[in-house]
């Protein structure tokens, strides 16, 4: 059971499991361009999913993964939220982070639905970490039980670092 602000939440779809091949997505970047999983083809992907970039835990999650993992060879760190691209861009400017890849699922919520990340009651994404290899095979997942808590940074960072 997953909770948000002390209340149970429900999801549509099936959570990704280690070994699954991640379905392609179409998300909106801060420059309003469309980005898909294919845009990161051949790279390892750390997908950090947050409800809103403007909250303390979500900001911490985004900064932590970018600081710890952005220097890994052939790896991209992608943060996905339901925030409008304008808010994501403003956050990057305010934080002084120019190389962060922030993508939004605001347009049709398909990423959240396909990856079982969309909290039906709130129309926000839950907190999660998904790590994919170069072929989009899922190598690590964490869907948090309490959306108001941190992900297991150490486990996710270690999982990303051991990918060949």
UniProtKB/Swiss-Prot annotation:
The active site is at 58 (cysteine sulfenic acid (-soh) intermediate). It is an enzyme of class 1 (oxidoreductase). The keyword Repeat does not apply. The keyword tRNA processing does not apply. Gene3D superfamilies: Glutaredoxin (3.40.30.10). One of its GO terms (molecular function) is thioredoxin peroxidase activity. Disulfide bonds join 58-92. CDD domains: PRX_Atyp2cys. Residues 16-162 form the Thioredoxin domain. Pfam families: Redoxin. Its EC number is 1.11.1.24. InterPro entries: Redoxin (IPR013740), Thioredoxin-like_sf (IPR036249), Thioredoxin_domain (IPR013766), TPX (IPR002065), Tpx_CS (IPR018219), Tpx_Peroxidase_subfamily (IPR050455). Thiol-specific peroxidase that catalyzes the reduction of hydrogen peroxide and organic hydroperoxides to water and alcohols, respectively. Plays a role in cell protection against oxidative stress by detoxifying peroxides. PANTHER family: THIOL PEROXIDASE (PTHR43110:SF1). Belongs to the peroxiredoxin family. Tpx subfamily. This is Thiol peroxidase. It comes from Streptococcus agalactiae serotype III (strain NEM316). The lineage of its organism: Bacteria, Bacillati, Bacillota, Bacilli, Lactobacillales.
């Amino acid at each position: 059971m997953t909770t948000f602000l002390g209340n149970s939440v429900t999801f549509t779809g099936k959570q990704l499991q280690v070994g699954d091949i991640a379905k392609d997505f179409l998300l909106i970047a801060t420059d309003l361009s469309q980005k898909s999983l294919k845009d990161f083809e051949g790279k390892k992907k750390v997908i950090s999913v947050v409800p809103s970039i403007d909250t303390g835990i979500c900001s911490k999650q985004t900064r932590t993964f970018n600081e710890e993992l952005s220097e890994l060879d052939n790896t991209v760190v992608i943060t996905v939220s339901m925030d409008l691209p304008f808010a994501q861009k403003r956050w990057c400017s305010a934080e002084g982070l120019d190389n962060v890849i922030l993508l939004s699922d605001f347009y049709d919520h398909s990423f959240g639905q396909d990856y079982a990340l969309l909290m039906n009651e709130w129309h926000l994404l839950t907190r999660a970490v998904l790590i994919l290899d170069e072929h989009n095979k899922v190598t690590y997942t964490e869907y948090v039980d309490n959306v108001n808590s941190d992900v297991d940074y150490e486990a996710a960072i270690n999982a990303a670092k051991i990918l060949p």
